[in-house]
Amino acid sequence: SFFLIPKNSIYMTAQLIKQDGESSWKTHLFNFIDAFNKNPTVDFVQDAPLNNLSPKLMALIASTVETLCIKHHVKISSWIRAILPLSEPWFVANIENLKALSLLESPIHFRKRGIFVFANFLDRA
C-alpha cells in the first residue's frame, strides 16, 4: 500500500525530514499542514512515521497530527497515542523572553507532550 500513501502524508513528511536532516522539519511539516488542511482525510495520517527521528520531532509530529485531526474531525490513529511526552520541555521558538507566552498559549496536545509553541503555530496563510 506504499504507493497509495499521499505525497504529503505524515509518513512521507517524516521520511523527508530524515532525508534532508532534522533542521529541515519546518519546511516539511508546514507542507504537510497545508496539504492536510486542504484535504483533511485519514489517508494523510493513518500510516505511522518510522520512529527514526529524535524524540522531540516525533512528539512534535504527533502533537501536530493529533491537534489537526481533532480540528477536522478525522479519526486519530493509534500510533499517535504511542508517542510519549518528552523528558525535558521543548520551547520550539527557543527565545528566552517568549517562553512564558508559549507556556500560556501552547495547545493541549502539544503541552501534554512537553512541547511549547505559540497559539498560532498551526495557522497557515
Which residues make up each language-model segment?
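Charged, helix-prone or intrinsically disordered regulatory segments positioned adjacent to compact structured domains
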Residues: F2-R81
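Generic hydrophobic secondary-structure signal
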Residues: S1, L29, I33, I61, ...
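Charge-dense, extended regions
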Residues: K75-A125
